């Protein structure tokens, strides 16, 4: 695997969405910003906020699309074109209904699994050959409750578990940055914290 050059967190912009389950991807990249001391800057040509940080001595761009979840691909593809980055150097962090809170999983390639930000990105790229960080938010139990679930806030216990999973993912990120994605996956997937 090639080293990562762009990490995108999916979510919805605006204070009213800031603490929702759907914004787990935003939460991941915000945690990277907090650890690095960098700051977000609005970049209208990329339809989102951007920052450049170093992880394991490697420079990497961070992106938070301001397009709302369902149109995330517009921002992601603009950034890939502008920075001349191939999709295999991309990691997209997003919420995952099919994983329990406290669980995070890395993967490469695949479909969208019903996640609309991934659906839009895959549709615009024409393929799913990029890396993903799936941050578990749990499932409400019935498909009719999914929309209010993802747009709602997690309870205290689930919120803490999501934070722990994000921390575990950040801990293995240096391996992924160096091109050791399989090793990063192995460590994250066998971690007791994720």
UniProtKB/Swiss-Prot annotation:
User: Could you tell me where this protein is found in the cell?
Assistant: Cytoplasm
| GO MF terms held by the record | peptidyl-tRNA hydrolase activity; tRNA binding
Q: Where is this site: Discriminates between blocked and unblocked aminoacyl-tRNA?
A: 12
| Taxonomy, superkingdom | Bacteria
Q: Where is the active site?
A: 22
CC terms in the record's Gene Ontology section? cytoplasm
List UniProt keywords, sorted A-Z. Cytoplasm, Hydrolase, RNA-binding, tRNA-binding
> Which amino acids does the record list as binding tRNA?
17, 68, 70, 116
Site (Stabilizes the basic form of H active site to accept a proton): give the residues: 95
State the reactions this protein catalyses.
an N-acyl-L-alpha-aminoacyl-tRNA + H2O = an N-acyl-L-amino acid + a tRNA + H(+)
Q: What is its main location?
A: cytoplasm
Report the record's Gene Ontology biological process terms. protein quality control for misfolded or incompletely synthesized proteins; rescue of stalled ribosome
What the entry lists under CDD domains is as follows: PTH
Q: Which family does it belong to?
A: Belongs to the PTH family.
Entry function: Hydrolyzes ribosome-free peptidyl-tRNAs (with 1 or more amino acids incorporated), which drop off the ribosome during protein synthesis, or as a result of ribosome stalling.
Q: Subunit info?
A: Monomer.
The identity of this protein, by name, is Peptidyl-tRNA hydrolase
Per the UniProt record, the source organism is Xanthomonas oryzae pv. oryzae (strain KACC10331 / KXO85)
Encoding gene per record: pth
